């Protein structure tokens, strides 16, 4: 799965922090969270159009605004690792259009609901209103995909490898539909000061490769995440771990590669075990087979029919395993 992701906007944005978390867990389809802490200079526009584009997004997916969950006092402390200090509603007329939240350590931020969401093949389009120019602003949303897993998967006889190769705003292989956005008054958000990349996977997966930005691997706090994620997804105690990566870049272009592996007892493993067992049985009997008999008949005439059958099975297993190995290449 190509996880290259592009962030575009029709308004110049300073993205102070970008959060992206992939969830490949048991019991549900894969989903991805995005969070943006951004600042806006004075603008005459009434709304901002933000586009998150990636090949894993399709029009059949659901993009859910997580505003109601994120402004909960308990969830704020959990997600931002800081103590909630106070909240002030931002009202336009009788309706709340966001809230200004202060923390003990971090600066005050305005949390905004997403005014409009559209999900298309290859991208999600978000309309944001009522932002603050005095403080930074924050939105968070989740894309529920139709994929079982988002990782690139490679198999061998004893293990399965899950590769998460995520690139943000990579110009190396810019898709044509991104170029069409750039031709239509949109621009890549190149000012992304920090990027946080997280991957939630089943706990039996073992991290086997990571790059410079890797920070930690922890057990998912299932009760807190269960409440935070709308209680729509099954999260069981100690069943999932989450890998945390963090990088800073001047040009807004990021690259993260994290690999997990897990051992498995698959069909090929069982076939290898059967083949080894048959081969060992033949080796144990080879002395008596090669021992000359009184009739002087060749040794292969002394071999029981069952041994010939075992040899044919072993040859068949070798051919099968070689063919499987070539198909994977």
Located regions from the model:
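N-terminal pre-first-transmembrane soluble regions of secretory-pathway and organelle membrane proteins
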Residues: 1-135
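Low-complexity, intrinsically disordered segments enriched in Ser/Thr together with acidic residues
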Residues: 110-113, 117-149, 247-268
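Hydrophobic, helix-forming membrane-interacting segments
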Residues: 264-329
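Short aromatic-acidic-glycine turn motif
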Residues: 57-66, 203-210, 220
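Beta-strand elements of well-folded, non-transmembrane domains
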Residues: 36-42, 54-56, 143-149, 201-203, ...
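Surface-exposed, acidic/Ser/Thr-rich flexible loop segments
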Residues: 122-217
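Cytosolic-side membrane-insertion boundary helix
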Residues: 227-293
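Solvent-exposed, non-transmembrane regions of membrane-associated proteins
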Residues: 201, 215-230
């Amino acid at each position: 799965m190509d996880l290259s992701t592009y962030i575009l906007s029709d308004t110049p944005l300073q993205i102070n922090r970008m959060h992206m978390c992939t969830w490949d867990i048991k019991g549900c389809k894969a989903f991805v969270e995005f969070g943006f802490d951004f600042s806006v200079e004075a603008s005459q526009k009434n709304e901002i159009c933000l586009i998150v584009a990636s090949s894993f997004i399709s029009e059949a997916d659901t993009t859910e605004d997580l505003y109601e969950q994120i402004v909960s006092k308990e969830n704020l402390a959990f997600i931002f690792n800081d103590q909630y200090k106070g909240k002030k509603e931002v009202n336009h007329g009788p309706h709340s259009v966001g809230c200004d939240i202060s923390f003990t350590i971090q600066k005050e931020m305005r949390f905004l609901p997403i005014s409009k969401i559209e999900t298309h093949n290859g991208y999600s389009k978000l309309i944001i209103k009522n932002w603050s120019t005095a403080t930074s602003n924050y939105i968070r949303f989740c894309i529920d995909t139709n994929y079982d897993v988002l990782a690139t998967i490679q198999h061998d006889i004893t293990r399965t490898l899950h590769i998460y190769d995520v690139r943000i705003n990579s110009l190396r292989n810019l898709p044509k539909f991104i170029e069409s956005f750039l031709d239509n008054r949109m621009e890549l958000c190149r000012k992304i000061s920090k990027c946080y990349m997280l991957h939630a996977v089943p706990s039996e997966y073992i991290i086997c490769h990571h790059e410079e930005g890797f920070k930690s691997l922890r057990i998912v706090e299932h009760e807190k995440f269960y409440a935070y994620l709308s209680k729509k997804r099954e999260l069981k105690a100690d069943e999932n771990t989450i890998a945390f990566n963090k990088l800073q870049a001047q040009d807004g272009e990021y690259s993260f590669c994290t690999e997990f592996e897990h051992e498995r007892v698959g069909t090929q493993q069982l076939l290898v075990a059967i083949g080894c067992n048959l081969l060992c049985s033949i080796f144990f009997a080879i002395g008596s087979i090669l021992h000359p008999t009184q009739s002087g008949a060749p040794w292969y005439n002394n071999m029981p029919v069952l041994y010939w059958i075992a040899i044919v099975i072993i040859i068949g297993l070798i051919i099968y395993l070689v063919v499987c190995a070539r198909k994977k290449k």
